[in-house]
Structures are given as C-alpha cells and as structure tokens.
Amino acid sequence: MTDISAVAGQPALVRNELNLVWLDMEMTGLDPDTDRIIEIAVVVTNSTLDIAVEGPVLAIHQSDETLAKMDDWNKNTHGRSGLIDRVRASSVTEADAAAQIAAFLAEHVPPGKSPMCGNSICQDRRFMARWMPELERFFHYRNLDVSTLKELCRRWQPAIYKGFQKRAMHTALADIHESIDELKYYRERFLIPAAPAGETA
C-alpha cells in the first residue's frame, strides 16, 4: 500500500465518510454467473481527489480449467500483462481478497458511505455481488461511474471527449488511476461551475 499523494508533505488521508473508494477488477469474461474475478485493486481518495492511498492489489487464483474458457481477447490481454501467470501462482481466493480489501477500506471510510467508484463500475459490482457479496455490502448502494460523464461528453462536447486518451493497460491498479485522472479531466473541462449570481465577466 503506497501513498500516491502528488504533493510532498501533503497530510495523510484521514478516515472520513466523504472519502471515495475506487475499484477495478479484471475478470475471465463478462458474465458473472459463469466467469470469475482474477484481479482486484482499490484506491481511496478524499472527496476532491487530491489525496489518495493505494490498497491491496491481488491476483486471485483460478483453476486452469477456468482460465482455459477465456476468449481470445482475454487470453491475449491478460497473457501480455502477466496476469495469467500471477493468477496461476496466487494462493489468494475470492474470500481472502474480499477480507483483505474490506479490512483496508475500514481504515479509511466507514461502511455503507462510499459509492463504488470507477469506469463501467456496474460490471464490477455485478461480479462482486456474485463472488464477494460481503465486500459488495461495504459500499453505499450508489455508484460513481466516470463512464456517465464520458457518454455525456461524447454526445454534448465531442471535442472534450476526444481529448482524453486512455492507455488501456487492463491491469486493475492502472485502470483505477486512469479513472481518477479521467474524472479530474472532466471536472476541469466539462463540469465547469457557473459564475455566482450577479458576477459579470
């Protein structure tokens, strides 16, 4: 677990109900009933995204039979990243991972307070509800999905939409940092506060 605060000397992240829990998982496919989780990572930020701390990054063991059922895209992507080898070498189960993540999160945010934050996060939530239900219940029922802003930008401000280039590394921790960076990008360019009443340019 590493402090990823950008500014030297910044205060540590204080436990607060307004802190945001960012999560990403890599899976063997898209169907939570037949596919499995193979990697999970979390990052907790303060509400303004200025201070952050990384949590556990865990490859989750799955059988060779489960890995063999992956389609070519998943085999190629997770093979190139080294994740398949990490999954085979791991002894961490889904229950182990859920317990480690929950213990880390409890140090930084009270249960039931943070929405689940990320990109297309409803998909992660579906898998978590299926395979890590106790961890899923740690979160508030709401989601903070950066994909919502992405889709609105694509329709309303296409130039801004095209300005953020994703690296598409498809590892859980890298994807989380990219989601946080993407939200900062939209905050600066798309979510522009209105001028106070009576203020003129």
Curated annotation (Swiss-Prot):
The cellular location(s) given in this protein's UniProt record come to: Cytoplasm
Principal localisation: cytoplasm
Return the SUPFAM superfamilies for the record.
Ribonuclease H-like
Q: Which Pfam families match?
A: RNase_T
Molecular-function annotations in GO: 3'-5'-RNA exonuclease activity; nucleic acid binding
Function field: 3'-to-5' exoribonuclease specific for small oligoribonucleotides.
- Name the record gives this protein: Oligoribonuclease
Upper lineage is: Bacteria, Pseudomonadati, Pseudomonadota, Betaproteobacteria, Burkholderiales
